[in-house]
Amino acid sequence: MIGLVQRVAHACAKVNGEVIGSIDEGLLVLLAVEPDDTERKAERLLDRISGYRIFADPNGKMNLSLKDVGGELLVVSQFTLAADTKKGMRPSFSSAASPELGERLYDHFVEKASALLSRVQTGRFGAEMEITLTNIGPTTFSLRVE
């Protein structure tokens, strides 16, 4: 399971021009599910993301987590992160989970995140979305749980 984590001042997900998820200070997570992923892997990735110390402490050092700062979370499904781009001029998506598994584990991740954090917003699984964000830093990390 892959999470592309971006520290944001604001992020928003729209479908057909309608805002379906929006946050202020926090993390935008683009989430990709791979064929061998499990609920346990989703929970491990959530633990890493929510505890990852990428927010500044009073001394300006990256020393605080999303939980520490009471930040918000926007989770967006992004199967293209699992693409195989090693050869050719077109990505292969055979390394992405089936839509059924992807949606089940995406929903599990969101459910667990909602129980752990005070404000969780989502995109819409499988939808064509417009994502806007203001990245702070920019600060972006790719986290993977195998």
Curated annotation (Swiss-Prot):
GO terms for cellular component: cytoplasm. GO terms for molecular function: D-tyrosyl-tRNA(Tyr) deacylase activity; Gly-tRNA(Ala) deacylase activity; Ser(Gly)-tRNA(Ala) hydrolase activity; tRNA binding. Keywords: Cytoplasm, Hydrolase, RNA-binding, tRNA-binding. It is found in: Cytoplasm. Its EC number is 3.1.1.96. GO terms for biological process: D-amino acid catabolic process. Pfam families: Tyr_Deacylase. It catalyses: glycyl-tRNA(Ala) + H2O = tRNA(Ala) + glycine + H(+); a D-aminoacyl-tRNA + H2O = a tRNA + a D-alpha-amino acid + H(+). It comes from the Bacteria. A motif (Gly-cisPro motif, important for rejection of L-amino acids) lies at residues 137-138. Homodimer. NCBIfam families: D-aminoacyl-tRNA deacylase (TIGR00256). Belongs to the DTD family. An aminoacyl-tRNA editing enzyme that deacylates mischarged D-aminoacyl-tRNAs. Also deacylates mischarged glycyl-tRNA(Ala), protecting cells against glycine mischarging by AlaRS. Acts via tRNA-based rather than protein-based catalysis; rejects L-amino acids rather than detecting D-amino acids in the active site. By recycling D-aminoacyl-tRNA to D-amino acids and free tRNA molecules, this enzyme counteracts the toxicity associated with the formation of D-aminoacyl-tRNA entities in vivo and helps enforce protein L-homochirality. A Gly-cisPro motif from one monomer fits into the active site of the other monomer to allow specific chiral rejection of L-amino acids. This is D-aminoacyl-tRNA deacylase. It comes from Hahella chejuensis (strain KCTC 2396).
